[in-house]
Amino acid sequence: MKLLLDTHVLLWSLLEPGRLTTGVATALEDPANELWLSPVTTWEVLVLAEKGRITLEPDPFHWIRTVYTTIPFKLAPLNHEVAVESRLIDLPHQDPIDRFLAATARVYGLTLVTADERLLHSQAFSALPNR
């Protein structure tokens, strides 16, 4: 399975693994599955750190670089196709990060791993719920 981690699932998997369901934790640990990330997740992690909502040591930039060089994530590029799909996809809200992640899942044929109930109500893409 190709799993696209949303921001909270990424952070929980590394900082608070107890917040993951058994099913999600098992899926993330399964070597048969591919773990994918979007650049918008990197951006959102850095924004959360800048706002003081999370603490990443020694600093957010070093932390994120270390994560991406030690864990074999695949990059789901933010390209024109994803940008267009983010406006076409049927979601109940306009949050741009959620729209980019949902569109990325559709464009690349990925399963979005999320706890976001607003996203989990959509049938527009494949999702693995963390609830």
Task: Please identify what each model-predicted range represents.
Residues 1-37, 51-66, 70, 108, ...:
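Short, well-structured N-terminal submotif of metal-dependent ribonuclease cores
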Residues 87, 123, 127:
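Phosphate-binding/catalytic loops
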Residues 45:
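Phosphate/NTP-binding elements of NTP-utilizing enzymes
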Residues 55-57, 61, 69-117:
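Active-site neighborhoods of divalent-metal-dependent phosphate/nucleic-acid chemistry enzymes
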